[in-house]
């Protein structure tokens, strides 16, 4: 099974963006009206089409990261926007339970305690079945006014993460600082800064089961692994494998073969999760390869640096280990199809709770190819 842990709803219907425009302008936006057909239309020619073409079985789907915009408006504006967009993500996952697993955004706001996020986090996980969320280490939008991630300022949300057993992807939003292009600089800055902050603190002594995913291949971290090992050593911190790597993971949103190969050479396989962020920051076709930059599955399929068994860990097992609610979510959706009637065409024919192994149900075509495909070997 191919599980993409990093997807955003970048193609949401125009009505959502108009609602947001009115909200930011201080107007009462009224009730958001988006039909199921509009949602289907926004996905069928984009994310769903690419899933089919690239062989991805399921995508973890969250609000568009650049549109979280925690620096816009006050805490009330952020709360209303988060709830609205999270509800849309829930509708997507309900319409396409086989394709999308819901991941949320939080109503963060500069200078406001993350404790204000707990109600929305609980609602998303307990009521809507979300399996994780995005945590913005810089709600100021490129000015970095929040305390570092190891600071007790963040502890209320960490305590709830541990209680609910959900991880966070540490993901900044758009930048209002003209010095930092938001996807080319601010995103990579955010990934790198988050990792360095975690080196500086002792967060995981207080929260040994807390889990973070650092996206975009970890920013500059793998390329400068020796620097960070050396800094940790100079700071009298434990080796990184003991200090962070039981709790910190990296995704594969790296858009060329040498970058993926470097990630695989530096970071332990058990700390790498497959992701593409398709229809995201980089949407074009690489003229050197003739393929989309963000078709990251091709890079993993092509590499000879890891075994077929390790590829299976990256494509499936690591993701479901870091996001334990995702395995339960997928099994529940498959169970519902078995207990309410015939399974949807393309789904496996054996109820997953009666089969051996820990994997949830996945399309039968993927299972039939397991003998020859490295993704399922």
Q: Can you annotate each of these PLM segments?
A:
Residues 57, 63-194:
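Active-site gating/metal-coordination segments in enzymes
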Residues 8, 138, 173-174, 218, ...:
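Catalytic metal-binding/acid-base residues of hydrolase active sites
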Residues 3-7, 59-61, 101-104, 133-135, ...:
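Hydrophobic faces of well-ordered beta-strands that scaffold small-molecule active sites
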Residues 6, 51, 89, 124, ...:
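Conserved, mostly hydrophobic/aromatic
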Residues 1-58, 338-341, 345, 350-366, ...:
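An N-terminally biased module of ancient metal coordination in phosphate/nucleic-acid-related enzymes
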Residues 179-200, 207, 211-366, 374:
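H/E-rich (His + Asp/Glu) clusters that bind or coordinate divalent metals
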Residues 50-57, 91-100, 164, 202-210, ...:
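A structural motif corresponding to the C-terminal end of an alpha-helix
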Residues 42-51, 113-123, 259-262:
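Short, acidic/polar
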């Amino acid at each position: 099974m191919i599980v993409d842990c990093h997807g955003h709803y970048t193609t949401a219907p125009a009505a959502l963006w108009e609602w947001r425009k009115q909200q930011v302008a201080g107007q009462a936006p009224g009730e958001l009206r988006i039909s199921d057909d509009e949602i289907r239309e926004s996905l069928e020619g984009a994310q769903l089409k690419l899933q089919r073409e690239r062989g991805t079985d399921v995508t973890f789907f969250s609000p568009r990261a650049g549109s979280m915009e925690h620096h816009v408006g006050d805490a009330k504006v952020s709360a209303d926007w988060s709830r609205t967009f999270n509800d849309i993500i829930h509708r997507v996952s309900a319409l396409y339970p086989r394709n999308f697993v819901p991941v949320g955004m939080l109503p963060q706001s500069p200078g406001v305690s993350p404790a204000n996020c707990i109600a929305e986090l609980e609602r998303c996980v307990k009521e809507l079945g979300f399996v994780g969320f995005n945590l913005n280490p810089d709600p100021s939008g490129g000015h970095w006014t929040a305390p570092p991630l190891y600071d007790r300022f963040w502890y209320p949300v960490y305590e709830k993460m541990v209680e609910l057993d959900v991880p966070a992807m540490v993901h900044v939003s758009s930048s209002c600082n003209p010095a930092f292009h938001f996807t080319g600089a601010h995103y990579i800055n955010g990934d790198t800064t988050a990792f360095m902050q975690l080196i500086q603190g002792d967060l995981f002594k207080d929260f040994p089961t807390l889990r973070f995913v650092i996206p975009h291949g970890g920013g500059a971290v793998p390329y400068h692994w020796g620097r960070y090992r050396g800094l940790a050593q100079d700071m009298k911190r434990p080796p990184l494998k003991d200090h962070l790597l039981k709790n910190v993971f990296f995704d594969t949103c790296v858009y060329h073969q040498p970058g993926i190969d470097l990630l695989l050479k530096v970071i332990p396989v058990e700390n790498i999760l497959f992701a593409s962020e398709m229809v995201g920051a980089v949407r074009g076709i690489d003229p050197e390869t003739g393929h989309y930059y963000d078709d990251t599955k091709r890079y993993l399929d092509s590499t000879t640096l890891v075994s077929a068994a390790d590829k299976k860990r990256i494509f499936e097992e690591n993701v479901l280990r870091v996001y334990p609610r995702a395995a339960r979510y997928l099994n529940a959706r498959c169970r519902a199809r078995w207990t309410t009637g015939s399974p949807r065409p393309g789904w496996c024919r054996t109820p997953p709770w009666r089969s051996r192994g820990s994997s949830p149900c996945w399309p039968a075509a993927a299972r039939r190819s397991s003998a020859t495909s490295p993704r399922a070997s």
